[in-house]
From Swiss-Prot:
It comes from Saccharomyces cerevisiae (strain ATCC 204508 / S288c). The keyword Nucleus applies. Belongs to the RSE1 family. It comes from the Eukaryota. Its main location: nucleus. It holds the Pfam family Beta-prop_RSE1_2nd. The lineage of its organism: Eukaryota, Fungi, Dikarya, Ascomycota, Saccharomycotina. Belongs to the SF3B complex, a U2 associated sub-complex of the spliceosome. The SF3B complex is composed of at least CUS1, HSH49, HSH155, RDS3 and RSE1. This is Pre-mRNA-splicing factor RSE1. It is found in: Nucleus. Keywords: mRNA processing, mRNA splicing, Nucleus, Spliceosome. PANTHER family: DNA REPAIR/RNA PROCESSING CPSF FAMILY. GO terms for molecular function: U2 snRNA binding. The gene is RSE1. GO terms for biological process: mRNA splicing, via spliceosome; spliceosomal complex assembly; U2-type prespliceosome assembly.
Length: 1361
């Protein structure tokens, strides 16, 4: 399955093999395969392919399932109008990692996600918001949104606008100004960026030597000028800030180190842009303390009645003296407020923690923000300990209103990379290594006259020691954004649905990522046995909005439950009402509500038309009985139509008269040539025009129901699926208006067809293997795809239904219809943003379900019959989409069971504890995550204490943490142990053993004891084993422990008093430190060295030793590796590359024909060229053979784990899931057919060349249309903003499709050329283009339609994962 001919074989479990066999049988006869092969054939003949597929090569498709979360850039502004006529408040927040952007809205006091944007395929180095607040009347600045200015390793300065286009938010590039060469360089001016507060200029700086300044002209057109350069050799920039100077000449300040100086010297330099002279002047240069690391500008102090000159007041000073900006400089243990003219140097010591609360003696400032009030301002500064300090500058009335600096402790939060204060009183803290938080100001700290807690510049050497607050004093948490950076280790909990367990680095919570639709159960009750199907319809006999009738069918029996807002009880008011329904001696096959208040009950022997006669009272208005000996097989209905099929091959068509509420039978009964087994029409419509009919031979017929036309009740199209159909539903997708037919087959395959409204044709055929049981279908309408777990909790807390509905509508909930598929497990099929998705339902297997609405469950309610026969009422949420493929569940091992007490006090304590837990930085850090050899759903977590030699063990089974022994703790503390590595080995079948390598060169062996009845675990120390060096890699090898001590491979067995050495293998001298190992079938061993790439060993049972026989010719700094097959290894290095290596065919031929013992005794006759090379280059050829490089790909994250799965969510192929250090989750999927490789390669090519394609087309249209001469003379990189026009009317700059202008091929080949890996992230960007753009690009693939490309891209997520 991983390529390479006969040698590339992945062993499959019997269950997986059986599923794949059934899937193959089900899919071979489908018409889709023929269409796809034809499309691929046309593609190969009409387009020149750059990727040539060979039988012995491995082609991989890469897809990022969860983007990295190392957020390092943020800015605030009003980027896009979410609602027409909305107030333009600076309440939107844009955050960015190195590769992508996310936009949030904070107006309602929460981080509400607006949009996640495409992968930019570049490394963002800086990002700032560009506002046009003072552009004059001609530019109408109030109509301009906030723009984004970005620099990246593309070497460009990019100005980007967020626009609404085709119903979706997208990035539009306005400027791509070339600055320097690509990639990251010390002298490239892309590391620092500041923008004048009035939007007049953009200042860029490199780490060393170069600075650029661009003037921004926005009087009529948005332009940037040619750059003004500052070149200062040997000067290294530490920090940079722009100064608020109102309408004076723009000014910015830098901290720079002089590399040419003999001693370390740090300079504070003020630069002023002389607008009249178009020149930059170095206005001031001061030598400051070498410990300086931070600079922040202050507002114009003269506006706050503060004297900024040496004269008594500001009016006596000349212009040069009056123009005197101030900055705050951060040093070790103190700060300095200094002005440009050198009049003031106001020093204040930074308050220090007490010794017991501080592990670091020195205190430095890492971030800060200025907040202007109506008549005042203040500054928040954060130290490296996370402490926030409030700094104020006020006029000293005792010293001629000269500036007086005061510094006081404010609060303690996690370390932040950037701080932002919104106008509505919210504080956002961006953290690279922690979660991001949105706070609300409760108060503004201590009073200025509280001198005991305030340090001032009057006493610059005075120090202050304080105790940091355990809980927040001046802030409260409103919302948080989960970050998984860094992610040290992960484990696969389940492959169907895909579930990954990891640990949060700072708060040590267990994070579970699940690719499934979440289901939360609210009510559960038992039912009589053998319940098969249910229907929920509004109760026409009551006036309540949420009163419904629930019909549950059993063999020869029907139960009716009446549900209102407060209760659910069986409907048994009187005998007359009971006689209206058919409750016994027959099976209900269909129930619906037609007209205004008519209930239709269809049983196998009769049809009943029931109407209400009073509150909870009903009467039978009509009973329709088929001819003698004939039974009703199936039925379907819309709001006014009812169709039933009979066992004599006839269809009976009914229509309801809305005025009289009478059911009218059509006298003509169409007769079919085969017995209909299933019929389906659109349920939630007044009149359906098409009827789908399925028989037992797998034939689907489409019959016209257009009663005004000649083809009424005649078959207009056919489709054969060559398998018996178990269920069928017809649904009209409201988002795109398509009519879809959903079909479940007896062999466990689900199919979806697009039905033509006019001719009933079958197109866009999709299918998915769901399980081994026949597929039955249920329909859920008006489901909100945007509902998540947090909104569920808020909804449960809100008792007011109207208020709740308003909140839901204001949150921008999007509605869709979905089909629930019931087989061996339950799946949900839905279409979101024109992308079809089918995912499993988490932790719930249903037999039948229906939409449920109640006062307590306003949206996404589901009433269902579970596979265990219980009636459940719950809610579905967290629908996986392209942007949110996983939903996240957090659980803490720090929680303990609470005893009884006052509920109100407990709630307050819980809220306080929850807030403290959010901000708390755990003293334990995750070290490793282990799965049990025979039970992958059992996960063991090992954490190390950050301050002392101590580790913590916790165990989770099926997502639930077990208690340790008889205690209430969910963990076991091991003292005097610092875990370096660990493994779980089953030396015997009776027990699992935990082996921990401690930092003091000990191997500790524990016996793991699990009590599933009491949900508890324990570990028992058996013995300790002394070792010569710490072990960084260990794994199970047969019934032994395989370890790597430095460069030596040692095999241990279980002894009574210690571990016993069974084998010792000395590796080649080039191997110095083994950091990763993996074995294949207990025969081969792949060893990854920290510098020397991968070496392949084979186990020699006779010599009881491992023999090296293949190594690499390229040095690779391995972080992790895994076997794909016996000859192929996938690995990753610390530079963000992933690669696969394969042993050469001649080597595999020798291995297959010889015993491993012959490798060492010289019995094998190697080829002459191999012997010659080894004699000439003995240092290079430690092994006689070298790996062949199959694939190479840059993922821009350090991969920490690979997980090889035989099948992802019942798919038809294996997959490789990886997790990166920065929180990335991705996968590599093998492409098994040449046609698939060609098609995917073509899609990648047209997307990679889209920048050139669009720009060349724009230039061609510009030339043909004879555009104005003044536009032709515009400078390179400038852009004209002419409002919102169509794609054809827009002015396009180079690199606009890729946003930042980074070449995709160069990006994915950052360290080495990309090889035989297709970038699915780039291919999926095709789905984000408008229809016009898609059609334009598809022209490059002749005879291939846009629908073919979309279907090919979508097939990866639906069928391969």
């Amino acid at each position: 399955m991983w390529g390479g001919g006969k040698m590339a074989v992945v062993s499959l479990s019997p269950h997986t093999a059986k599923m794949r066999k059934l899937f193959g049988q089900a899919s071979t006869t489908m018409a889709y395969d023929g269409l796809k092969r034809e499309a691929e054939r046309r593609t190969r003949s009409d387009h020149n392919i750059t990727m040539v597929a060979k039988d012995d090569e491995l082609y991989l498709y890469h897809l990022t399932l969860k983007k990295q979360t190392n957020f390092v850039h943020s800015c605030i502004g009003h980027f896009v109008d979410l609602e027409a006529g909305s107030k333009r408040e600076q309440s939107q927040l844009c955050v960015a990692t190195e590769t992508h952007l996310e936009l949030y809205d904070t107006a309602d006091g929460e981080l509400k996600l607006i949009a996640k944007f495409q992968n930019l395929f570049a490394t963002i180095t800086s990002m700032k918001s560009l506002d046009l607040p003072h552009s004059g009347s001609r530019a109408k600045a109030s109509n301009w949104p906030t723009f984004l200015a970005l620099t990246s390793d593309s070497g460009n300065l990019s100005i980007v606008q967020i626009i609404m286009h085709a119903g979706a938010l997208r990035l539009k590039t306005l400027v791509n100004q070339p600055l320097t060469r690509t990639t990251l360089r010390r002298v490239s001016p892309i590391s620092y960026m500041e923008i004048d507060p009035n939007g007049r200029c953009i200042i860029l700086s490199s780490v060393e030597q170069n600075k650029l300044c661009f003037l921004v002209d926005y009087a009529q057109k948005l332009r940037i000028s040619s750059p003004l350069e500052i070149i200062r050799p040997h000067m290294v920039t530490l920090d940079m800030a722009v100064v608020d100077v109102n309408f004076n000449n723009p000014c910015f300040v830098t901290l720079e180190i002089d590399n040419a100086a003999t001693q370390l010297s740090v300079h504070l330099i003020f630069y002023v842009l002389e607008l009249g002279l178009n020149h930059i002047v170095k206005k001031a240069d001061y030598l400051v303390n070498p410990s300086a690391n931070f600079v922040l500008s202050l507002p114009d102090l003269s506006r706050y009645n503060i004297t900024t000159s040496l004269s008594d007041n500001n009016y006596d000073a000349d212009y040069d003296t009056l123009f005197n900006p101030f900055v705050v400089i951060g040093f070790e243990n103190h700060i300095l407020v200094k002005d440009m003219n050198g009049f003031f140097s106001l020093k204040v010591e930074i308050p220090k923690r007490s010794i017991t609360n501080s592990r670091h003696k020195n205190v430095t400032i890492i971030s800060g923000i200025v907040q202007k009030l109506k008549n005042d301002f203040f500054v928040l500064l954060q130290s490296n300990h996370g402490d926030l300090f409030k700094l104020t500058v006020s006029p000293d009335t005792n010293d001629r209103n000269r500036p007086l600096v005061q510094l006081s402790y404010f609060d303690t939060i996690q370390n932040s990379h950037q701080l932002h204060i919104f106008k509505n009183g919210y504080l956002f803290a961006l953290s690279e290594m922690n979660n991001n938080f949105l706070f609300q100001f409760e108060k503004l700290g201590v009073e200025k006259n509280d001198f005991s807690n305030v340090l001032t510049s009057k006493d610059p050497n005075k120090s202050l020691v304080f105790e940091p607050s355990i809980k927040l004093q001046n802030l409260s948490i409103l919302s948080q954004q989960l970050n998984l950076n860094p992610s040290i280790k992960s484990q696969i909990v389940s492959d169907s649905p895909l579930s990954i367990a990891t640990k949060h680095f700072t708060n040590n919570k267990i994070i579970t990522l699940t690719n499934a639709v979440n289901y939360s159960n609210l009510i559960s009750t038992s039912l009589p046995p053998n319940a098969t199907k249910l229907w929920l319809i509004p109760d026409p006999a009551t006036t309540g909005d949420n009163n419904t009738l629930l019909f549950i069918t059993f063999p020869k029996k029907t139960m009716i439950l009446q549900i209102d807002n407060e209760s659910m009880e069986e409907l048994t008011p009187d005998e007359a009402t009971r006689s209206a329904f058919k409750l016994s001696q027959d099976t209900t096959i269909h129930t619906c509500l037609m007209g205004s208040h008519s209930i239709i009950q269809v049983c196998t022997a009769e049809l009943r038309h029931i109407v209400p006669t009073g509150k909870s009272r009903y009467s039978n208005k009509l009973t329709w009985v088929p001819p003698a000996g004939i039974r009703i097989v199936c039925a379907t209905s819309s709001k006014t139509q009812l169709i039933i099929s009979l066992s004599n091959y006839e269809l009976v068509y009914f229509k309801i008269d809305v005025s009289s509420d009478s059911l009218i039978e059509l006298t003509t009964h169409p007769e079919l040539d085969t017995m209909p087994s299933k019929v389906a029409i659109v349920q939630d419509t007044q009149h359906a025009d098409l009827l789908a009919i399925a028989d037992n031979e797998g034939m689907i017929k489409i019959m016209s129901l257009k009663d005004q036309k000649e083809d009424f009740l005649t078959v207009i199209s056919l489709q054969l699926v060559s398998e018996k159909i178990s269920d069928m539903i017809m649904v009209r997708d409201s988002s795109i208006g398509q009519l879809n037919l959903h079909v479940g087959l007896e062999n466990g395959v689900y199919m979806k067809f697009h039905i033509g409204d006019v001719d009933g044709s079958f197109t866009d055929i999709k299918r998915r293997f769901l399980g081994l049981k026949p597929v039955s279908l249920s329909y859920l309408r008006e489901i909100s795809v945007s509902l998540n777990n947090e909104e569920e909790e808020e909804e449960e807390e809100d008792d007011d239904d109207e208020k709740e509905e308003e909140e839901i509508n204001s949150s921008g909930a999007k509605w869709m219809s979905c089909v629930v598929c019931h087989s061996s497990s339950t799946w949900v099929s839905y279409t979101w943003k024109n992308v079809w998705t089918i995912r499993q339902l988490k932790d719930q297997n249903m037999l039948s379900c229906s939409k449920f609405v109640n006062a307590d469950v306003a949206i996404n309610g589901v009433c269902s019959i579970s596979s265990s026969g219980r009636l459940n009422i719950g809610r579905v949420s967290n629908f996986p989409t392209l942007d949110n493929w996983f939903h996240v569940h957090e659980s803490s091992v720090n929680k303990q069971e609470n005893g009884g007490g006052d509920e109100s006090n407990e709630e307050e304590e819980d809220e306080m504890e929850e807030e403290m837990e959010m901000l708390q930085i755990s003293t334990f850090r995750p070290r490793t995550i282990l799965s049990f050899p025979n039970n992958p759903k059992s996960i063991l977590f090992i954490d190390n204490h950050s301050g002392k030699k101590q580790c913590r063990i916790s165990l989770q089974i099926d997502g639930e943490c077990l208690k340790f022994g008889s205690s209430d703790h969910l963990y076991k503390i091991l003292d005097d142990i610092d875990c370096v590595s660990a493994a779980i080995i089953d030396f015997t079948r009776q027990a699992d053993h935990l082996i921990i390598c401690a930092g003091d060169k000990r191997l500790l062996t524990y016996k793991i004891l699990v009590n599933k009845d009491k949900l508890s675990f324990d570990i028992e120390l058996l013995h300790q084993t002394e070792i010569i060096s710490p072990i960084h890699a260990m794994l199970k090898f047969k019934n032994f422990l395989l370890t790597a001590m430095g460069s030596t491979i040692v095999l241990y067995g279980l002894g009574k008093k210690q571990l016993l050495r069974r084998s010792v293998t000395q590796t080649p001298v080039s191997i110095t430190k083994i950091v990763s190992m993996h074995q294949w079938n207990y025969e081969r061993l792949a060893v990854g060295d920290i510098h020397e790439s991968v070496t392949l060993f084979i186990w020699d049972p006779a010599g009881n030793v491992f023999i090296p026989y293949v190594d690499d010719s390229v040095k690779r700094h391995v972080t992790v590796l895994k076997f794909l097959d016996e000859a192929t290894v996938i690995g990753a290095d610390r530079y963000g590359n992933a690669w696969t290596l394969r042993s050469p065919p001649e080597c595999e031929k020798i291995m297959s024909n010889h015993d491993p013992s012959e490798l060492s005794n010289g019995a094998i006759k190697y080829p002459l060229d191999v012997i010659t090379l080894q004699q000439k280059l003995p240092n290079t050829y430690d092994c006689k053979f070298k790996f062949q490089l199959l694939n190479h790909f840059f993922v821009n994250d350090i991969i920490t784990d690979f997980h090889i799965l035989d099948s992802l969510s019942n798919s038809d192929r294996p997959g490789c899931i990886y997790m990166g250090l920065q929180g990335t989750v991705g996968c590599f999927i093998p492409l098994l057919s040449k046609g698939n490789v060609f098609m995917m390669g073509n899609i990648e090519n047209i997307m990679a060349e889209a920048d050139d394609t669009f720009y060349l087309d724009y230039e061609s249209r510009k030339k043909n249309n004879n555009m104005r001469k003044e536009d032709d003379e515009e400078e390179s990189g400038s852009v004209v903003l002419q409002g919102r026009h169509g794609i054809e009317d827009e002015i396009i700059c180079e690199g606009s499709c890729s946003i930042l202008g980074r070449d995709h091929q160069e990006y994915r080949s950052y360290y080495a050329p990309v090889r035989k890996v297709i970038d699915g992230d780039l291919c999926e960007n095709f789905l984000r283009l408008s229809l016009n753009e898609q059609e334009f690009l598809a022209k490059n693939l002749k005879s291939v339609q846009v629908e073919d490309i979309i279907q090919t891209i979508n097939e990866v997520r639906t069928n391969y994962m």
